[in-house]
From Swiss-Prot:
InterPro entries listed in its UniProt record: G_SEPTIN_dom, P-loop_NTPase, Septin
Gene: Septin6
Domain Septin-type G: 39-305
Principal location class: cytoplasm
Regions annotated as coiled coil: 321-407
Family that this chain belongs to: Belongs to the TRAFAC class TrmE-Era-EngA-EngB-Septin-like GTPase superfamily. Septin GTPase family.
Biological processes, Gene Ontology terms: cell differentiation; cell division; spermatogenesis
Binding of GTP, residues: 49-56, 104, 185-193, 239, 254
Protein's cellular compartments: Cytoplasm; Cytoplasm, Cytoskeleton, Spindle; Chromosome, Centromere, Kinetochore; Cleavage furrow
G3 motif: annotated span: 101-104
Phosphothreonine PTM positions: T418
Name of this protein: Septin-6
Lineage: Eukaryota, Metazoa, Chordata, Craniata, Vertebrata
Length: 434
C-alpha cells in the first residue's frame, strides 16, 4: 500500500490527509508480529469424552509428538480433570500448550452430574483471570492464561445418535467454551453409516439448541475454506502415532487385518481437516473468541453480581466512580438498615427479657408471700401449742402443789394422833394391857 493511500480515521467528521512522504507506521504489523513471537503464545485444549475414545492418542497425533504425562486411574468416584502443560517450538515460534483431560467421564453408573466438574474447572480459570485483571498492580503480560480456548468433544462411534450425557454436557458448555465435536475412532463404522451419523448428530445438536463453534467466514482470506469445513462438522477422526510403510513412504496409520487406515489421508478420515481448522487456520480466532465472547460473558455476569453497571436506569452512561459511589451508598444504606434492625431486635429482646424478669420477680414475691404466710401459720400453731403446753404445765404444777400440801397435812395429822395415844397409854396403864 502506498503511503499516500494511508488514512487515519478519528470519527465520522474526520478528514483524509494525504502523506507527503514515508512516515513509518506501516511497520506496525511487523512490530506486533515480532513482539508476539518474542512473548510466545499459549493455547489450552479441553478433551471431553468417555474413557477409551483415544483422546491422548489424538493429541499426540495432532502435534506430532509424544506427550508424557502421569497415567490416569479410573477408580475415582467422580470426574477428575487432569491438566498438563508443555512448551513446544516450531521454527522460531514458541507455544505453551495445555491439555486438560476429563478422567473418568462417563464411567459412573449415575452420570447426572458428570458435567459439573468440567463447568467448575472452566469457571475457575475465568475467575483466576478476572482476579488478575482486578488487581491494582497487574502483570497480564507475564500471566499464564489458563482459560480454555477450545473443547474437543469426543463422540463414541455408535452410528445411531448422541447419548443423553453428550447432549447435556455440550449444552452446559456451549456458553463457556468453543466446542468442536469429533467422532472418535471413526474407522469403527462404515462410510455410509458415518455419513448418516454426522447428519443425525448435526440434527440433534440443532434441535436441542447446542451452539458449537463455527469457523469464521467474515475474513476473506479464510472465508471459503472455513465455510467448506463448517459443512464437514463433526469431524470423523482417527489417531495414531505408529508409522507404517505404504509404498515407498512411511505414514502414520492404523493397521487392521482387513487393511490400513491412513491418518493423514482425507479419503480415510477428517484428521487433516481438524488439524488445519484447529491449528493452522483458526487457532488465533479460538483465542479471540474465548476472550471476547466467553470470558466477557463471565466477566459481565460477575461484575453485575458485584453491582457494577454501564448505564443508570435512564440509560445514561454510568462511570466506574459513580458505580462505586452508588454501591457504597447502597451498602451503607443496607448497613444502617441492618444496624436499625439489630437495634430494634436488641430492644425487643431487652423488653422481652425485662418482662420475663418481672414475671419471675412477681412469681418469687408470690412464692415468698405464700411461704411467709405458711411460716406465720406454722408459727401461730406452735405458739398455740406452746400456750396450751404452758397451761397444762401450770395446771400440773398446781395439782402437784395441792397434792404435796395434802400429803403434808395428812402426815402432820397422823403424827398428832400417835403422840396423843402414847400420852394416853402412859397415863392409863390398862390401855397397854388391852
Amino acid at each position: 500500500m502506498a503511503a499516500a493511500d494511508i488514512a487515519r480515521q478519528v470519527g465520522e467528521d474526520c478528514r483524509t490527509v494525504p502523506l507527503a512522504g514515508h512516515v513509518g507506521f506501516d511497520s506496525l504489523p511487523d512490530q506486533l508480529v515480532n513482539k508476539s513471537v518474542s512473548q510466545g503464545f499459549c493455547f489450552n485444549i479441553l478433551c471431553v469424552g468417555e474413557t477409551g475414545l483415544g483422546k491422548s492418542t489424538l493429541m499426540d497425533t495432532l502435534f506430532n509428538t509424544k506427550f508424557e504425562g502421569e497415567p490416569a486411574t479410573h477408580t475415582q468416584p467422580g470426574v477428575q480433570l487432569q491438566s498438563n502443560t508443555y512448551d513446544l517450538q516450531e521454527s522460531n515460534v514458541g507455544l505453551k500448550l495445555t491439555i486438560v483431560s476429563t478422567v473418568g467421564f462417563g464411567d459412573q453408573i449415575n452420570k447426572e452430574d458428570s458435567y459439573k466438574p468440567i463447568v467448575e474447572f472452566i469457571d475457575a480459570q475465568f475467575e483466576a483471570y478476572l482476579q488478575e485483571e482486578l488487581k491494582i498492580r497487574r502483570v497480564l503480560h507475564s500471566y499464564h492464561d489458563s482459560r480454555i480456548h477450545v473443547c474437543l468433544y469426543f463422540i463414541a462411534p455408535t452410528g445411531h445418535s448422541l447419548k443423553s450425557l453428550d447432549l447435556v454436557t455440550m449444552k452446559k458448555l456451549d456458553s463457556k467454551v468453543n466446542i468442536i465435536p469429533v467422532i472418535a475412532k471413526s474407522d469403527a463404522i462404515s462410510k455410509s453409516e458415518l455419513a448418516k451419523f454426522k447428519i443425525k448428530i448435526t440434527s440433534e445438536l440443532v434441535s436441542n439448541g447446542v451452539q458449537i463453534y463455527q469457523f469464521p467466514t467474515d475474513d476473506e482470506s479464510v472465508s471459503e475454506i472455513n465455510g467448506t469445513m463448517n459443512a464437514h462438522l463433526p469431524f470423523a477422526v482417527v489417531g495414531s502415532t505408529e508409522e507404517v510403510k505404504i509404498g515407498n513412504k512411511m505414514m502414520r496409520a492404523r493397521q487392521y487385518p482387513w487393511g490400513t487406515v491412513q491418518v493423514e489421508n482425507e479419503a480415510h478420515c477428517d484428521f487433516v481437516k481438524l488439524r488445519e481448522m484447529l491449528i493452522r487456520v483458526n487457532m488465533e480466532d479460538l483465542r479471540e473468541q474465548t476472550h471476547a465472547r466467553h470470558y466477557e460473558l463471565y466477566r459481565r455476569c460477575k461484575l453485575e453480581e458485584m453491582g457494577f453497571k454501564d448505564t443508570d436506569p435512564d440509560s445514561k452512561p454510568f462511570s466506574l466512580q459513580e458505580t462505586y459511589e452508588a454501591k457504597r451508598n447502597e451498602f451503607l444504606g443496607e448497613l444502617q438498615k441492618k444496624e436499625e434492625e439489630m437495634r430494634q431486635m436488641f430492644v425487643q429482646r431487652v423488653k422481652e427479657k425485662e418482662a420475663e424478669l418481672k414475671e419471675a420477680e412477681k412469681e418469687l414475691h408470690e412464692k415468698f408471700d405464700r411461704l411467709k404466710k405458711l411460716h406465720q401459720e406454722e408459727k401461730k400453731k406452735l405458739e398455740d401449742k406452746k400456750k396450751c403446753l404452758d397451761e397444762e404445765m401450770n395446771a400440773f404444777k398446781q395439782r402437784k402443789a395441792a397434792a404435796e400440801l395434802l400429803q403434808s397435812q395428812g402426815s402432820q395429822a397422823g403424827g398428832s394422833q400417835t403422840l396423843k395415844r402414847d400420852k394416853e397409854k402412859k397415863n392409863n396403864p390398862w390401855l397397854c394391857i388391852e
